[in-house]
Amino acid sequence: MFISKVFVLLFALLVGSALAAPVRIERSLGEPQLSTRGIGQMAQAAGVAIKIKKNLKPTKGKSVFWSGSRPSKNGPVSVEKDAERYAKAKGKEVLAPTLQKQGINIPAQKDSPYSYKLWKYASKVYAQRTSGSAHAVLGSTRRPGNIYDTIEKPELMKNKKVTKLTEHNAETGKKTVVK
């Protein structure tokens, strides 16, 4: 039986994460419930990771990334909707709808402790497989260690298939070509 190196690596990563997480049994689920739930979530995450590896294929010249927030009358708002509007208006695509379109469903964070890691993995694969020109809609405020600055942008910058990367300031509308 053939088991890919990526599957083994992801499985080891997920198992290691589960073992390293501190759990106070007396305040959480009983031991049998905890282990059943943990193994099920781990198996689900491994399945999603395999689907990401096999199926996530951005269309050439259509990738749009986003990160951060911008000010509004009611306080800071995420630029996610700005990126989605930009992508729709320009015939491009952001990661989440691309995943859905390709049959990949990352569980919500409340449903799986592996959700954040799966989003990071999907973001990395999306950036690595992007080709042609790419765009990023960015807020004037970004969390330290955000996925765009730590994973997506570095992958896009070293990706030889990406011919141009343009960053759009969601607050000012200013465009900056960074690659």
Regions found by a protein language model. Give the residues of each.
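Basic, amphipathic N-terminal segments that precede the first structured/catalytic domain
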Residues: 38-41
